[in-house]
Structure formats: C-alpha cells, structure tokens
Amino acid sequence: MTLMLLDSASLWYRAYYGMPDTLLAPDGTPVNAIRGYLDMTARLIGMYSPNRIVACIEGDWRPSWRVDIFPDYKANRLEEDGEGEEEPDLLTPQIPILLDLLDEFGIPMVGVDDYEADDVMATFAVKEPGPTRIVTGDRDLFQLVDDKRDVKVVYLAKGLSQHDLVDKAWIARKYAIPGDRYALFAMFRGDPSDGLPGVKGIGEKGAALIANNYADVDEAQQGARDAHPSLKPALAKKIIEGADYLKIAPTLVNCARDVALPQLDISMPTKPADLSKIYEIKERYGLGASVDRLITALKW
C-alpha cells in the first residue's frame, strides 16, 4: 500500500544532466529529460511497487510568504531579469511535453499556488497513510522522515542505481544528529543552494552540536542565554547574535504541512484513458522504449 511522491523538478533536472542532449525528436526537439524521467519512474515503480503515486510540481518555487520575510530566498537561482528560475535552454521546452505525457498516463500531478513541491509532498506525507517513499535529490526533505509512519526518502544524490533509502538511522549516521532533527540542524547550518545563510559563523559541526542538545530553536536560544555548559561561549554568542535570522528560519526551512490539496484519486493508473494518444506522443517525439518501459512497469 505504498505511496510514492515524485519530486518532479528534481527528477527532470537529474534526467536532463544524466542523459545525452543528442537525444532528439524527429523535429529536433530535445527529449533527454523526458526519456530520463520516464525511465526513472518505470524503474522506481519496479523497485517499490507503489499502489499510489503523485508527481509533485512547483506551484511557486519562491512562495511570496517566504520571500516576503527573506528576499534572498532562492534569489541565487533567478534569471538575469529577476523573474523566473534559471534553467537550461534545452530543458525548458521538454517540461510541457513531459507533463502532457504524464497526464495521458493518468499519473496524478499536483502543484498548489504559492507553495513549493516540497510543501505539497510534506502535506501528502502527513495526511496519507504510509508506507510513503519520497523520491528526490534534495536533502531538505529529510525532515519528513518518520519511522513510525514508515515515511522514507529515496535519495538520488548518487543516482538511482546507488540511491540511499533514508530513515532516521541514516540521518543519524550521516550527520551525527538525532534523526528527527534535520530541519533544526539545517536552520543553523544554512543551505547555499536555497540562498539560506544559516547563522553566521555556525557550520555543520556547530549545527550538529546544537541539534544534539536542543529540540528546537527556542531551546537553543535559551541555552545560549543561560550560558549552558553544552555550548561553548563562542557558539552561544553566535546563537544570540543570530536572533533575527532565527526568527524567520523555521518558516524558511520547515516544509508546510497544511497545504490545501485538491481532491483527486492518487491510485496507480490501471489503464490509460486512451493508449493511442500515448503512442502518438511517443512517435511524434521519438521517445522509443522509454514509453514502453513505463507501460510495462504499470502492467498494462
């Protein structure tokens, strides 16, 4: 009864960079990201046999409620005009084709206005019964790991063939922190990929020490003010001086878990609405065996 949540942008970026850009449709349209995404999805279904699946997409990759409190949030990824997200020119035309194809396959796609895909996945993870497997290359989602409800992250940093299945023990081994405190750790450490600086002067070791001794930001700040022996004076001083950033860090780092999700059937599609449309897209864009592999994985 496994639910599989696909971090779609993470997958199509990984597919784009992992497949040769010489893969082209008959009309010259690049299709490497499309083919890679389909291939990964087929393999993931074969590995984990989910009975529910959602392709989660960005409603807004820089939600206003995060940017309003921290204008630099993900600003490092903005295009030169300061509007959209910078992405490879050869990837951009592939995304609408891929989304059309997923729609024809009957794979549910969910994106909610003013929320990131991370927030959508987090809400599904807390609202839907487990087991849940969250497929991503993004470590931000480690905060969703929940051993009691069997929520794990299929982490693709090393590729699908060598992926890690992240549970609390994995987090504890990797970062030397309690497995349920990754978000707290990230608040202090920061995340350059999202333009988040963390608390000035506190790196991974300092953040790990804090996460090992305190359950949340308020506790850590109180410990710093009290000059608790678990904190060296220099570290306590940095926590105190980082008070302004720490006021907003939870909103920036914690995934929203109360997104208003649309009512839809997230069961694995048992048959296509019109298989001929899938084959038409396959032929038009020269998608070859990638489409066939997903059809096989779905047991149509």
Cite the ranges covered by each PLM segment.
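Noncatalytic, basic helical substrate-engagement surface that gates or grips nucleic-acid strands
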Residues: M1-V135, L141-S161, L246-I248, N254-P262, ...
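Non-catalytic nucleic-acid-binding/docking modules located in mid-to-C-terminal regions
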Residues: S49-V54, E86, I107, K148, ...
